[in-house]
A protein has these predicted regions:
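Active-site glycine/GP-rich loop and adjacent strand/helix microenvironment
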Residues: 1-173
Length: 173
């Protein structure tokens, strides 16, 4: 509640924070029926997953666009960000990383398939990470209907250790 009051009072132009914290703040605003008088220009959540449903809900509550940024602490942050036009797709930043979605044998999966995320860093010349296994699970994508030519990933599902693998090999997230 105190943070919600500060947001109302300061009317920030932009909010950047941990996704779960942003979801919590949005839920407090929604539950208490608080109206945002001056919405921020946009919100970016990072550090954990914002699913497309979260993006839409937070956007509705704050009355502004909401984006999810994906990256790795080990590599300095941003690897991909939600498309401003298609919330179900994330654009990879090709100047910074190569992002691959691979199967258990480290073979790239086809679009629409789920796999582990590997990142290759393109900016650290002293000690680069090459095909670094982030421990994250994502869904491969073959592009975005927005028309931008950036490589894409459809969705970040979460951490590999947050899943259950059945005896038949099926994974539950």
């Amino acid at each position: 509640p105190a943070l919600v009051e500060k947001i109302q009072k300061k009317a920030p132009y932009f909010i950047y924070g941990i996704s779960s914290s942003i979801r919590f703040i949005a839920s407090q605003i929604n539950e208490k029926g608080i109206a945002i008088h001056k919405p921020p220009h946009s919100i970016i959540g990072t550090s954990d997953t914002l699913l497309p449903a979260h993006l839409k809900s937070i956007s509705s509550i704050f009355k502004c666009p909401v984006y999810s940024r994906y990256g790795s602490y080990e590599m300095g942050g941003g690897a991909a960000q939600t498309c401003p036009d298609v919330s179900e797709v994330m654009h990879i930043i090709p100047e910074l990383v190569i992002l691959e979605v691979v199967d258990d044998n480290n073979i790239p999966v086809s679009p629409g398939k789920t796999g582990r995320i590997l990142l290759t860093e393109l900016t650290n010349y002293a000690m680069p990470f090459i095909r670094y296994d982030t421990g994250d699970i994502g869904i491969a994508s073959d592009g975005c209907s927005c028309g931008r030519s950036f490589p894409t990933i459809r969705e970040i599902l979460g951490r590999d250790y947050e899943q259950i693998k059945t005896f038949s090999g099926h994974r539950i997230y």
